[in-house]
C-alpha cells in the first residue's frame, strides 16, 4: 500500500481497506523549471514540483491531475523530478510524491468540431495517462496534429471522436473539460448532445468536468449525462487556486487505476462528494452584454440584451443549459454524489494572504480549515470576525453576486 497510511479508515471489503481522499484533476503548469512558457496565462511559479509541494503541504490534496504533461519541457522536468528521489512511479499508475500525493499525468487538448449551425467549434478535452512512457508516446503522436506541442491546450487538427482513439492507444482516458462554458467546450459552442460528437464511442467516456459556472443540479437536467460521473476541478492557473473545486473519493489506494475505478463506480470505488463553487461565482454563469458591459438581467434563457437590444453577447452557462436541457426539473440518478457548495479561502471577504498563511501555519492544510476546524479553533488564531466569515462560507450563508462575461462572481459579507 502506497502513500495513504494516514488516511481515514472507512470499511473493509474486497480484502482491502477503503479510504476517503481529496482529488483535483485539472491543474495547469505556467512555466517549466527552465522558465520555458507552457500555459501563457498561468503563473510562473506554477511548475511540476511546486504543484506537488502545494498539494502536500498547504492544500491537503491527495490526488492531483496535472494536465500539461505532454509538453516536452514538462516531460523533461518530470524525469528530473523522479531522479531527486522525492517521487517515484508505481505499477498501478501515477507518480507518488513523498508518500502523500499521487500525481496523475494529463494533457488538455483542444479539438476541432463541427459546431452549432454548421460553424466550426472547438472544445477542450482532459486526457489522463497511467505512466510517463504513455504520455511520452501520446506527446510524440500529437505533435503531428498540433503546431506547438510545447504549449498548453493547443488546438489539434482532429476531432474528439478521433482523439479518443489516440488516448486509448496510450492506455489513457478522456474526460470532456468544463463542459458548459461558452468558449472551448462541447455544450457551450459545439453541440447540444455529447453523443452527437462521440457517437458509438460515447460509452468510453467515464466522466465529464462540470466547470466553475455549473453544478450537479444544472447538469442533471440533461438525460444523456445520467450515466456519467461528474467531476469538480479547479482549472488552476496559479498555486493559490488549486482546490477551489475538488472531489472527495472513496478508494483503496492513491493511483491511476483506483482513480479510474472511482470514475467508473467500480468495486465500491466512487466519488462521494463534489465540492464546487456556487455556480454564480463562475466567470460565465449568466449571459453578458458586450455592448453594455454587464450581465443581462431576466429569466433564463437570455439571448438578446434587454437594455440595448444587442445580440453581441457572451452566453451564460445557466442560460445555455436552459436552452439545451430535456428535463423540466433536475432528476439525478441514485449513484450521483452530494454536491456541496464550497467557497475557497481566497474568495472569502477579509481573508488576505497574510491571514491565510497564518491559518495554514497553525492548521496545516486548507482542507483542515475548510472542513474540520471548529469556530473556537479558528477564533483562537484569527479572531472572531474572521472565524465567523469562514464558518459562514462553510455553511453557505454568504450572499453571492453572479459572474458573467469572463468576470468572476463576488462573495458579499453577511
Show which residues each predicted segment covers.
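Cys/His-rich short segments
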Residues: 270-337
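Acidic/histidine-rich helix-loop elements
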Residues: 29-45
Amino acid at each position: 500500500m502506497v502513500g495513504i497510511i494516514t488516511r481515514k479508515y472507512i470499511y473493509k471489503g474486497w480484502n482491502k481497506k477503503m479510504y476517503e481522499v481529496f482529488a483535483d484533476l485539472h491543474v495547469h503548469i505556467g512555466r517549466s523549471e527552465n522558465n520555458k512558457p507552457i500555459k501563457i496565462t498561468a503563473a510562473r511559479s506554477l511548475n511540476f514540483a511546486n504543484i506537488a509541494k502545494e498539494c502536500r503541504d498547504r492544500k491537503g490534496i491527495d490526488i492531483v491531475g496535472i494536465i500539461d504533461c505532454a509538453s516536452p519541457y514538462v516531460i523533461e522536468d518530470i524525469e528530473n523530478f523522479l531522479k531527486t528521489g522525492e517521487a517515484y512511479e508505481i505499477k498501478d499508475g501515477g507518480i507518488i510524491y513523498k508518500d502523500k500525493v499521487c500525481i496523475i499525468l494529463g494533457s488538455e487538448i483542444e479539438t476541432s468540431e463541427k459546431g452549432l449551425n454548421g460553424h466550426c467549434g472547438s472544445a477542450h478535452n482532459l486526457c489522463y495517462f497511467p505512466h510517463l512512457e504513455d504520455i511520452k508516446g501520446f506527446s510524440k503522436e500529437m505533435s503531428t496534429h498540433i503546431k506547438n506541442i510545447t504549449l498548453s491546450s493547443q488546438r489539434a487538427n482532429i476531432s474528439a471522436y478521433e482523439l479518443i482513439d489516440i488516448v486509448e492507444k496510450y492506455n489513457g482516458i478522456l474526460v470532456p473539460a468544463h463542459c458548459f462554458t461558452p468558449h472551448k467546450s462541447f455544450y457551450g459552442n459545439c453541440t447540444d448532445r455529447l453523443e452527437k460528437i462521440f457517437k458509438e464511442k460515447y460509452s468510453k467516456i467515464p466522466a465529464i468536468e462540470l466547470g466553475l459556472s455549473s453544478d450537479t443540479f444544472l447538469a442533471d437536467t440533461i438525460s444523456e449525462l445520467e450515466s456519467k460521473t461528474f467531476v469538480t476541478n479547479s482549472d488552476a492557473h496559479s498555486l493559490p487556486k488549486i482546490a477551489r473545486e475538488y472531489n472527495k473519493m472513496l478508494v483503496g489506494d492513491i493511483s491511476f487505476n483506483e482513480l479510474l475505478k472511482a470514475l467508473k463506480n467500480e468495486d465500491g470505488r466512487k466519488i462521494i462528494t463534489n465540492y464546487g463553487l456556487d455556480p454564480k461565482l463562475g466567470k460565465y454563469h449568466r449571459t453578458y452584454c458586450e455592448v453594455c458591459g454587464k450581465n443581462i438581467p431576466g429569466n433564463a434563457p437570455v439571448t438578446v440584451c434587454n437594455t440595448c437590444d444587442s445580440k453581441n453577447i457572451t452566453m451564460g452557462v445557466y442560460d445555455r443549459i436552459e436552452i439545451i436541457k430535456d428535463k423540466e426539473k433536475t432528476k439525478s440518478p441514485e449513484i450521483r454524489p452530494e454536491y456541496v457548495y464550497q467557497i475557497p479561502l481566497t474568495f472569502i471577504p477579509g481573508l488576505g494572504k497574510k491571514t491565510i498563511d497564518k491559518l495554514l501555519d497553525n492548521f496545516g492544510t486548507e482542507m483542515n480549515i475548510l472542513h474540520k476546524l471548529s469556530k473556537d479553533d479558528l477564533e483562537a488564531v484569527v479572531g472572531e470576525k474572521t472565524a465567523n466569515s469562514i464558518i459562514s462560507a462553510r455553511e453557505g450563508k454568504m450572499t453571492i453576486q453572479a459572474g458573467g462575461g469572463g468576470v468572476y462572481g463576488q462573495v458579499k459579507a453577511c
